């Protein structure tokens, strides 16, 4: 019996769901705003908020925990050098989810998930290489 309904499954296996949220976390950290379906945005928010809290801690163990989850060292650098210091005085609530109408084709409810005090220049077509806190390009 399917008791509880604690988490949404999105019609995917556990591994696929974990990879999907890791990829969405990477996109959100890189662009600071993404458009996705409303249920995915609602489930993504606590995942990324925990990553930002790790970025605020800033120690080696927190960095290794973040690398284990999002698997991109350049984005972990942005998380710890840019996002962590940006939200050092804020206790949670780093993200907002805004409803964005319905998708053409299947009428799925869409949402925009973004950082609260986001950098509007971070969003773009590809936004190029990831920049560190000083604005220089990271060596990959």
UniProtKB/Swiss-Prot annotation:
Listed Pfam families: Ribosomal_L17
Keyword Ribonucleoprotein listed: yes
Single annotated GO MF: structural constituent of ribosome
Matching InterPro entries: Ribosomal_bL17, Ribosomal_bL17_CS, Ribosomal_bL17_sf
A GO CC term assigned to this protein in UniProt: cytosolic large ribosomal subunit
Domain of life of the source: Bacteria
A GO biological-process term: translation
Keyword vocabulary terms for this entry: Ribonucleoprotein, Ribosomal protein
Family listed: Belongs to the bacterial ribosomal protein bL17 family.
Subunit structure, as described in the record: Part of the 50S ribosomal subunit. Contacts protein L32.
Protein name: Large ribosomal subunit protein bL17
């Amino acid at each position: 019996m399917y008791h509880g309904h604690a988490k949404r499954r999105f019609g995917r296996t556990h591994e696929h769901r974990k990879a999907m949220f890791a990829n969405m976390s990477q996109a959100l950290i890189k662009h600071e705003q993404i458009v996705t379906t409303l249920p995915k945005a609602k489930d993504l928010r606590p995942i990324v908020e925990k990553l930002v809290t790790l970025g605020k801690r800033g120690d080696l163990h927190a960095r290794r925990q973040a690398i284990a989850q999002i698997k991109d060292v350049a984005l972990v650098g942005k998380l710890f050098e840019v996002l962590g210091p940006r939200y050092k005085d804020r206790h949670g609530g780093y993200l907002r989810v805004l409803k964005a109408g319905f998708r053409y084709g299947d009428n799925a409810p869409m949402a925009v998930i973004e950082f609260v005090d986001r950098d509007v220049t971070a969003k773009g077509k590809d936004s190029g290489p990831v920049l560190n806190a000083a604005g220089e390009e990271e060596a990959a």
